Amino acid sequence: MKHCFAIILSLVCTAGLLIAVNGCHKEDDDDSISNTLLLRGTTMKINMALFAQYDDAYNFDLDAGGEHGVHGYGGFEAAWIGKTTDLKGPFFMSFNPQDGGSSIDPVIKSGTVKITEVKGGLHILVEAVEENGQKLKIDVLAEDEFKKNWD
């Protein structure tokens, strides 16, 4: 009997937590992509889709079809589409050559990320300052295929 009560209590608490978390992720009740929250643990692939989850850090993979991919860890736990979010360092961003060469790993001190909905997808702008004072800018468009797979 005690086990049944514990299981029921656990299920009720879990359901309550899920409802509370879901309520925190939206500013209003419409289903617009503008109210989607990028959660800690999300992975993004430019020109492709939301394709993986990681438990340990916010992780995004920006690849606009050029010679180098851009891989970022940490910095912010969540960013709302349509708003500017501060990056809080220090954290690493790895620039990984797609040909398998050595990566470049600057330590980001501070900066911002702004994600806006545009015709054809999402515009992602990251402007940051490395610990050595050097400025870093990432400006890419996540195209329709990414947006379609957002959910």
Positions of the model-derived regions?
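Sec-dependent bacterial lipoprotein signal peptides
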Residues: 1-22
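A detector of low-complexity, intrinsically disordered, Ser/Thr/Gly/Pro/Ala-rich segments
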Residues: 5-6, 12, 34, 41, ...
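Bacterial Sec-dependent N-terminal signal peptides
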Residues: 16-45, 150-151
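Edge beta-strand at a domain terminus
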Residues: 31, 127-151
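Short, hydrophobic/aromatic-rich segments at coil-to-beta transitions
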Residues: 31-34, 57-58, 119-125
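Short, well-ordered strand-loop elements centered on a beta-strand within folded domains, enriched
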Residues: 89-90, 123-126, 151
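Extended, loop-rich substrate-binding clefts of extracytoplasmic carbohydrate-active enzymes
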Residues: 107-131, 135-137
